[in-house]
Amino acid sequence: MSEIALTVSVLALVAVVGLWIGNVKIRGVGFGIGGVLFGGIIVGHFVDQAGVALSSPMLHFIQEFGLILFVYTIGIQVGPGFFASLRVSGLRLNLFAILIVILGGLVTAVLHKLFDIPLPVVLGIFSGAVTNTPALGAGQQILRDLGVPFEVVDQMGMSYAMAYPFGICGILLTMWLVRLFFRINVEKEAQRFEESSGNGHAHLHTINVRVENPNLNQMAIQDVPMLNSDNIVCSRLKRGELLMVPAPGTLIQAGDLLHLVGRPEDLHNAQLVIGQEVATSLSTRGTDLKVERVVVTNEKVLGKKIRDLHVKQRYDVVISRLNRAGVELVASSSASLQFGDILNLVGRQEAIDAVAAELGNAQQKLQQVQMLPVFIGIGLGVLLGSIPLFIPGFPAALKLGLAGGPLIMALILGRIGSIGKLYWFMPPSANLALRELGIVLFLAVVGLKSGGDFVATLTQGEGLSWIAYGIFITAIPLLTVGILARMLAKMNYLTLCGMLAGSMTDPPALAFANNLHATSGAAALSYATVYPLVMFLRIITPQLLAVLFWGLS
């Protein structure tokens, strides 16, 4: 068997063993995709014992390409919501998550100085303790840029593997200790979250109001500031027994019933101006009006604003809602359309069909991956990651690297959505497949490289002390911030658990947090809010630590 064929076969074996280990769960918690690392260590140990030679250049390429795939697909997935998460609504969550990252870096620095831990080892312990694989890749790359020998850099993978198991367990233990310490009732926390999120930014509501303000009589809808804003959409108007789709120039009359869509606080303000809410139904059933969901797939409308389509004037159709990446938004006239957006249309069937044809509504296109934008994004990301940032007094230039560059570029492209006929939408199933493939390849190689000396390090070397250092790096930041967030900020427990999981970019911890309450989405929401920024910081932190430690030594 050729060296290349042998290398591929061994990697496949690592993936099989590792994924099997990851699927083993104890009390509902397992290593998940992290099991591939341990599969690599096991196979790597026996490969080393047997004296089998694998292709080092090929392993190195597979490791780096796997990392690029992983971080790029993460960026594309969370890009649409990343910049929104940095606004005021997620500021508090992100500040606490940043504090966890900073404390982790400080604990790592203190341990490095107190116990004189070798730089590659302490960076590996840090990456494993915070369960962040891209941090491992970023740390290895900066060490190579600093001229550290390859065999020394590979120690990072070994120390990462030592610290990784408690990294996962430590998050779960912190959630449990916070719950125990504050005597938290999860059911009540879920109820409080639902009550508070009634005014949340992510939920759209509808109300039917009667026009009671005499100043609005015979006024065109477009002249009513409340109804001509980007915060509320008036999708139906009922006058007597007639239900119609209102156009901007439609004159409203006293006694008209309006069906409004928007955020609760905006609807409340509209109610104060227009009139009281009524229980009368404005359902389209039994009328010639229909409500349908249409998907934007036509390349010709990508990037256009809703107002530029003129669907009200041309087709007598109203766009009442816009669903983007699972988040419902008000279909404001200034919103730009992106591939995969789902629009709620209200109008007559023939008019809706005409608008749907203009928007595309080709469901099969949602399952197709446009590969050209994928490789454009990866290429631009690698270029961005290769740009050196020279800081006076530092021995090496700081770079985003192969972990940070593609991630930042994917976040930007995911937010932009489309440029001309190129769109960066990726079907969730395709995104997940590429992401899983990337992380499996990366962890398989890291495990293989670490496996040869792993057992000896654990039984005869400093393996146990590395595990202890990892426990400190995991536990101190999580417990400190967990207690502060609950005690001082009075943060909802389920939201807190999601934030802790997101601050460690740890899907198994999110799964555990979600299982605390079956129907509450609090944990998932806070996880998604902090994840993008934390992922970026986790990639940058080991590079900063490496450059600082190297300069001081």
From Swiss-Prot:
Membrane topology note: Multi-pass membrane protein
Keywords of the record: Cell membrane, Membrane, Repeat, Transmembrane, Transmembrane helix, Transport
RCK C-terminal domain mapped to chain residues: 192-276, 279-361
GO biological process, one term: potassium ion transport
Location, primary (coarse class): membrane
One term under GO cellular component: plasma membrane
GO molecular function annotation: monoatomic cation transmembrane transporter activity
Superkingdom of the source species: Bacteria
Annotated Pfam families: Asp-Al_Ex, TrkA_C
Subcellular localization: Cell membrane
Transmembrane segments: 4-24, 28-48, 65-85, 95-115, 158-178, 371-391, 403-425, 437-457, 464-484, 493-513, 532-552
Family: Belongs to the AAE transporter (TC 2.A.81) family. YidE subfamily.
Protein name: Putative transport protein KPK_0013
Lineage: Bacteria, Pseudomonadati, Pseudomonadota, Gammaproteobacteria, Enterobacterales
